Amino acid sequence: MKSGSRRAAASCVRFRIARGTNLMDLATIFGYLLAWGALGYGAWHASHGAIAAYIKPGEILLVGGCALGATMASMPLHSIIGALKSFKKMLFSKDAHIEHLIKEMVGYAETARRDGVLALETVAREAPDPFLRRGLQLTIDGTDPEIIERIMRIEIESMLERHKHGKHFFASLAKFGPGCGLVACLTAQVAMFRNLGGDAAVIGAALAVALVGTLYGALLQNLIAGPIAEKLGLKSKEEAFAKEIILQGVLSIQAGNNPRVVEMQLMSFLSSGQQAAMPKAA
């Protein structure tokens, strides 16, 4: 194996280490801790420590079950399974550093420029990203650039379509939450009105249950499903952004562009601050 191929393969290993570490999405975790911590303190303060007044298992089952059932009824089973996988991926996502990705693509361009495109064959086999692996292999095979772009573009669009199902699941759950909270509220109010003229304590307890049901619906929308749907949408855009960089890098390598040109082209995806922080290719 040529020295250029060995260097590219070693670079690929470093890329695998940088991208392959599963990290809990700290922003998601800290965000939920902050939101629920603030809610818990507010409820504790408002109830003078009687936090148990906000815990109604029956209402949790009613609101959660109704919202989940309505969401499942609106989607096919494979989309629901995909949504759960997307949620797991959101929590334990691979930290893809765009700056590092650009650096690796420039390294591949240097190898192809110096030793020929065929020198990337080892890199293509060992590339950790299947999308990158396919792009490099198509380049090595001498595939027409228009066909390469068409194949890789279809894969990006298919990925985005799959991600839409994951976002749709949690967005639907958020949409149905307040309505199901209203159902819980009305259900409790029926019991309350049946006891009008009776024990005031019973009426008060029924009214409290009604309000808690409404609260659960709002929480499901704003502190559970809604943020997940938004985060899934953001993650999808980030992944598509990284794949677009890979696509443009592969096409530039296939065209035989100078590594400096490849670097400048891919750097245009970054902000001026990110560009200034990146070391220039030799």
State what each model feature region is:
Residues M1-L23:
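N-terminal amphipathic/basic-hydrophobic helices that include classical n-h-c signal peptides
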Residues C12, G20-N22, L26-G31, A38-G166, ...:
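Large intracellular
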